[in-house]
């Protein structure tokens, strides 16, 4: 301030042109006068003005006064003599973490997100002054379902002035799932995302935040394993997303990321490998990780696997199909196979003994009998396969190849894979040639012509029942076929 200098008036009509002239003003300070046309009168409303100020200036380091505070008196609100300061000049992220309590962090979280009903799981207080300036607080939100995940919840400030809530290009993509505040004067403003990604300070800030997040997760895992397991279902998608998109984060997270089995027990990658490696290696010495995506729908194959002494993981998240593909690349001689993608006797191939004691003509006759009675489902193809299983195993099972099913699932989330989404679902009808009922079918269809086999199969109520039971156990018996199945059941009463 120079008391001898004349006041200056800056004026503009809203274009890039402006004028500067001397003005008649003796008191210190700046008056900003904006003129609103008749079409934008809502910007003169008190609530509208305060909402704009609160969004962009609610943590400005100097007080902002908007009128006077009001109180309820004599049945109405009246103004008091106290100024209505709408901003917090000393936000929590500017304070020393040592002097703060958990209540301070949760209270500030609800100040940032007043519509949130849940408490954050935990938080990270950032405070760096070299080689760049960075302060802030990042919160891990409590996720109840995949639909709760929202991006653009991190607010970027520069010296306590709000800049944006779109921080892509400033922090790694997976960190955009977090909530909170980042404040740094070293992040260039009003530049393209491509420029941000190449800026040296932004790279350092991004790397630092990633490391702090990983260190916090590792700290909780080491110091309180039970708490970490309790929170894992909410953390899982965040950690998997980070491992899929950030190589350095994968290397750190591989030590503490968890696998949950169908008995709700948690294991690290190393712990689970030790658990199954003595019993779940195939003939090629590949370690087979069996998993289910739904404990209810896949109860039967899960139960069969457990009776074999196998352990089954529960992988029911939207990123799991991508994540297990990454693990198969990273961990040598490892395969993930869903427990219903093959019969339990063949899901982990221990030897090459898979001979079928049927002639080609017997196979053709049996194939015709089953094919003629399998219902025609939209965008679904069935292929009959013969396998030698235990005679106490089910006579017919429906399976779906791991690769084709996985490609279909990935196509639903990933651009460039639409061709897999348009392909029909491919299922295998596994016929157990060792089962007494199938042996009887072989005898009764042998030597018959194709047409007569179809007629025989049409009249064989047991064959229809066996096929429908296989479809029912796979959740594929619907509509007319399900209704006919129920009718046949009542007819036996």
What are these regions (language model features)?
Residues 1-493:
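Conserved GHKL (Bergerat-fold) ATPase module
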